[in-house]
């Protein structure tokens, strides 16, 4: 039996589903972010180039998205129509458990990174959806400062790297490393599947088990994420790039951060007081 974590509730006027996975990276190559993009580029049951885009155009969804955080990746959907909800849930389940991207490198090259040369006399450039997205994100000084703070505070932890990917590191990600990370983390024993709404929960769980979970063998090794220990040496200074039109004077940034315990511990402490 597969010991996936399943949560169900019947309290909402719209039906919701989420598949979430613990995905703490070891580097800033953006593997978590790239997997989030590529699994939505076609799957075994839905071998379309961009089923996510088709769902955005053709479904009655009230919410449809995917997101990568520091140590988890989630795929939530919601709809007020029963049939539409089931289609959304099935599409997302097939995307995370049977993506084409682990069999065909094209989605990885498209969403992650690839070399591009349109004419023989042009300079060789790097392109990719996630690569370009993170170039824009990391052009912000605020983003650079945030990344630097985490890098310094959690130097020897996955929390000290950029889970979205740093443009300087993304080209270091190989297709083999991408597949290895997917197979290790996208397993039912490392998943949290959530059903929420006014639905027949048992029939939905039976569908999920029959179509997906039953094909996996239990490994008995649920991934554990250890709470990081922040460094005490907090004083650090680093330069950042500015444009030719900017002045160096009065253009410095300073950040102050505090390492706090888990929010549930803070809540318990406040309640005790």
Identify the function of each model-found stretch.
Residues 1-7, 11-13, 270-273:
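Short, small-residue-biased leader/transition segments that mark boundaries at the very start
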Residues 8-10, 14-26, 45-83, 105, ...:
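Non-catalytic beta-strand/loop surface segments
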Residues 29, 33-37:
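Active-site recognition of the HExxH zinc-binding catalytic motif
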Residues 38-44:
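Catalytic Zn2+-binding segment of zinc metalloproteases
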Residues 81-83, 198-201:
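Helix N-cap motif at beta-to-alpha junctions
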Residues 85-87:
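Hydrophobic or amphipathic alpha-helical targeting/insertion segments
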Residues 93-102, 212-219:
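A common structural junction motif
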């Amino acid at each position: 039996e597969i010991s996936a974590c399943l949560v169900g509730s019947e309290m909402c006027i719209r039906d919701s589903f989420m598949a979430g996975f613990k995905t703490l990276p070891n580097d800033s190559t953006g593997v978590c972010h790239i997997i989030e993009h590529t699994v939505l580029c076609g799957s075994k049951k839905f071998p379309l180039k961009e089923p996510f885009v088709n769902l955005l155009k053709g479904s009655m969804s009230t919410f449809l998205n995917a997101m990568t955080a520091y140590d988890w990746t989630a795929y939530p959907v919601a709809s007020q129509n029963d049939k539409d909800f089931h289609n959304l849930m099935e599409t997302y389940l097939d995307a995370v458990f049977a993506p084409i991207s682990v069999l065909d490198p094209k989605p990885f090259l498209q969403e992650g990174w690839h070399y591009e040369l349109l004419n023989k006399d042009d300079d060789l450039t790097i392109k990719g959806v996630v690569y370009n997205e993170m170039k824009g994100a990391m052009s912000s000084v605020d983003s650079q400062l945030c990344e630097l703070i985490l890098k310094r505070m959690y130097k020897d932890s996955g929390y000290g790297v950029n889970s979205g990917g740093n443009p300087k590191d993304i080209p270091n990600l190989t297709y083999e490393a991408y597949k290895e990370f997917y197979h290790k983390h996208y397993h039912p024993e490392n998943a949290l599947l959530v059903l929420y709404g006014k639905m027949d929960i048992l029939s939905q769980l039976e569908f999920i088990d029959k179509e997906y979970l039953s094909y996996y063998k239990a490994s008995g090794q649920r991934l554990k994420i250890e709470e990081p220990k922040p460094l005490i040496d907090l004083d650090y200074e680093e330069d950042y790039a500015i444009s030719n039109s900017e002045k160096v004077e009065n253009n410095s940034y300073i950040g102050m951060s505090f390492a706090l315990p888990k929010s549930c511990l803070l809540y318990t402490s406040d309640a005790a007081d």
